[in-house]
Amino acid sequence: MIIALGLVAGIVLGFITYRVILQQVPIRLMTMAEQRLLTMRNNASNIFFHGRAPTAKARQIVMPSPDLVYSSCVYDLAKGPLRMQGNLPPAGHYWSLSLYAHNTDNYFVLNDRELSDRRFDVTLHPPSSRVAENQTAVKSPSVTGIALIRMIQRREDDLAMIQASQQSTTCQPAQA
C-alpha cells in the first residue's frame, strides 16, 4: 500500500512539474517579453518597430546577433487577421520573418530565398479561423505573439538599404 501511495504521489508530482516547467514557464516568459516590448512602444501592438544594429547597451532582443538588424511587432489578433507586408533588401542580403506564439513556439519562418520578387505579404489569422495555410496565409496558434524580422548588416553603408526595407514594412488589419 505504501508503495502504491508513493507511486501515485510521484506521478502527481511529475504531472505538476511538467505543467509548471514545460507549459507555464514559456508562457510567462513570452508574456514578459511582450510586455517589455509594448512598454517601450507606448503599449502599441500590431505595429512594426525597427531597430538598428544592436549594441551592448541598446538592444530589445534577448542575446541579439551583432550583425543583424531587427524589426519586431507584438501582434494581437483579438480583433481579426493582420496583414504584414513590405520590401526586402536587394538580392544577396539575408532577410527573414519569424512568428512566435504566446508559448514561445516558433511556428512560421519565411526567408529571402523563398521570395524571388523581394517582397513579402503574409496574412496572420487568429487560432479560431478556418484558413488554408500557405506562404501568404498563416494561422497563429495563439491570439498574441511576436513577429520578428532579421536583416544582415555586413557593412556600415548597408544600414540605409536596411532602413528603406524597414520603412516599407507594415502590419495592419487585413481587409475582409
Language-model segment annotations:
Residues M1-A176:
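A compositional/structural signature for long, glycine/proline-rich flexible linkers
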